[in-house]
Each structure stands twice: as C-alpha cells, then as structure tokens.
Amino acid sequence: HWIKAGIDKKIELRLGPAMSTLDDLIKEGPEDYFDMAFIDANKKDYDHYYERVLTLIRPGGLIVIDNVFWSGRVLDKKNHEKSTSSIRSLNKKILHDQRVSLSMLPLNDGVTLIWKRP
C-alpha cells in the first residue's frame, strides 16, 4: 500500500526476529533517526523492544505499542502469566518514564501512543 501512496522511498521493510532487527538498526546507527515505530511482537519482550526503540526514535517522535490491555488480563492482579506480567510492568514503567509523554487509548485491545520528549 505504501507504494501506491508514493512513499515507498521513505519506508524500509525488514522481516526477522524483532530483537535482532532492532539490535541491527542500533548498530547501523544513527540514534534518534526514526520518526515513528510500532511495537506489536512477543509480549514478554515488550520492555526490551521499548528501550531499543526509544534509542532509535528522534526527540518528538512517536512510539505506538499495541495490546496494552491484553484482553483485560493486565487488570487481573492474580494473573502472573509471563506475557501479562510483562505488559503490566511496561505500562507502569512508561507511566513514570520522564523521557516520554503518553496517551493510552481504549481501542480494541488497547494502544499506547508515546511521544519522546526533546
């Protein structure tokens, strides 16, 4: 769809494991390069993705994280399943992260919009 939109020169598609792809992007540099990133991958590694993406996003850039409500399971304090605990933990971390501002949207399974502060 981005070819039809005429923005194919601005998008680079990379297919592969998220963690190693992010590590490759960091190695290739430069930091603060990307305008936007969308995180929707292995939930237990969300915190690792967040920290790596935060390095890659320019000040003023946007990070979008999907599934932040995890079908409501993040609200069940008795649920200690790894993916649920990871998302719950990241939600709390982002809320108190002075590097960013955020807005959590109740769309479908929850989406967090994160703005990287200058």
Protein language model features and the residues they cover:
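S-adenosylmethionine/decaboxylated-SAM
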Residues: 1-118
